[in-house]
Amino acid sequence: MSLRSAFALLPLFLLLIVANVESRKDVGEYWKLVMKDQDMPEEIQGLLDASNIKNSKTHAKENMGAIGEFEPRPYASAYGDNEIHAKENMGAIGEFEPRPNASAYGDNEIHANENKGASGEFEPRPNISAYGDNEIHANENKGAIGEFETRPNASAYGDNEIGAEFTDDFEPRPSMTKYNA
């Protein structure tokens, strides 16, 4: 056996020896039995922990009993420099509808009609999703659309320029998606 392999196995053997000594319940009684009723020297007693302290994991298991009924606590989290003023906005909510979602990726140019003068209700515009090198204008896709409600969403993948503003009062619009191969 080479010297390198002996040094590699040394920590394993030391661990086995220490683990066996610590696994004994009463080291002092074992010492007296082996050494024929001689007391353990104080130098060795300091090296071995012969106290009767329970393992923290076992102690935790003993204390766990049947948990009675409990109610979850309210939980609120804020991360970063967020400012939450729930009491200020309580009166302004009223009926809530989802906000439009606009995503742009890649080489597309999307221009939608802006509704700058709309302060009340307005007609929903179709939703457009484009993938590839497309130039899509919302004005070209006007047609008869049946009555259904979806969540507003505008997605385009490529280099995009989106010039659309959203107001607080809106209704969901229909969705149209175009994929190029």
From Swiss-Prot:
Q: Give the domain of life.
A: Eukaryota
Pfam families in the cross-refs: Organ_specific (PF10950)
sequence repeat positions = 59-84, 85-110, 111-136, 137-162
The UniProt keywords, alphabetically, are:
Repeat
Region entry 4 X 26 AA tandem repeats, spans: 59-162
Answer yes or no on keyword Repeat: yes
Q: Where is this region: Disordered?
A: 94-181
Respond yes or no to whether keyword Cell membrane is given for this record. no
Q: In which tissues is it expressed?
A: Expressed in stems.
Instruction: Family membership, please give it.
Output: To organ specific protein P4.
Q: What name goes with this protein?
A: Organ-specific protein S2
Which organism's genome codes for this protein? Answer: Pisum sativum (Garden pea)
